């Protein structure tokens, strides 16, 4: 039945762009930015199409299911740190774009980190939470044995949510400490 319905194979069996970046083979990552954005690349299930994940995240944002604080601070921190600490052999902007769009960053920032039960309550705490998730993600991607660090970063920051909420709790007006 395959020759009748499909003229060519639609399976990609190769290293993901993040694993190529992790191993230092920056020349192996020869994908166009548009290919990476629409998901025409190798990758794990659920993290392929940044475009569709972005559409889903923006839909939740516009329907007021989530706020902008966690996704923007999470993705922004990863973008800033990967740009600032890009390898000398790579173009910093290209390295940053591939690092942001390759892997589960969009899935984690838009859908996992914004879970009602595990994210901080107020906006300041949510920004701190997103920055922490982004910093831990970059640390794991650069220095640990894993290509991806989003899920581990979210789990570690979930342990600190109670402390972030305690530190960023608004003080009632007129009350002395």
Positions of predicted regions on the chain:
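Cytosolic-side transmembrane-helix boundaries in multi-pass membrane proteins
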Residues: 140-177
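Alpha-helical transmembrane segments of multipass membrane proteins
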Residues: 57-61, 79-83, 108-109, 113, ...
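Transmembrane helical segments that form the transport core of multi-pass membrane transport proteins
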Residues: 67-88, 92-99
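Hydrophobic alpha-helical transmembrane segments in multi-pass integral membrane proteins
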Residues: 85-90, 95, 135-148
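Hydrophobic alpha-helical segments embedded in the membrane of multi-pass proteins
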Residues: 51-54, 72-80, 99-113, 127-135
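Membrane-helix interface "capping/anchor" motifs
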Residues: 61-72, 116-127
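Long hydrophobic alpha-helical segments that form multi-pass transmembrane helix bundles
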Residues: 1-54
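Loop-to-transmembrane alpha-helix initiation sites
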Residues: 96-103, 126-128, 145-157
């Amino acid at each position: 039945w395959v020759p009748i319905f499909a003229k060519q194979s639609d399976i990609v069996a190769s290293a993901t762009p993040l694993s190529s970046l992790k191993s230092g083979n920056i020349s192996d990552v020869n994908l166009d930015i548009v290919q990476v954005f629409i998901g025409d690349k190798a990758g794990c299930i659920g993290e392929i199409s940044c475009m569709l994940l972005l559409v889903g995240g923006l839909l939740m944002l516009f329907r007021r299911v989530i706020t902008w604080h966690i996704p923007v601070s999470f993705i922004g921190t990863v973008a800033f740190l990967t740009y600032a600490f890009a390898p000398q052999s790579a173009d910093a902007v290209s390295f940053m774009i591939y690092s942001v769009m390759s892997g589960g960053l969009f899935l984690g920032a838009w859908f996992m980190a914004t879970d009602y039960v595990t994210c901080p309550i107020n906006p300041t705490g949510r920004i701190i939470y997103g920055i922490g998730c982004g910093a831990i993600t970059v640390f794991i991607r650069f220095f640990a044995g894993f290509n991806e660090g989003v899920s581990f970063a979210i789990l570690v920051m979930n342990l600190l949510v109670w402390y972030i909420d305690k530190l960023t709790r608004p003080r009632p007006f007129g009350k002395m400490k």
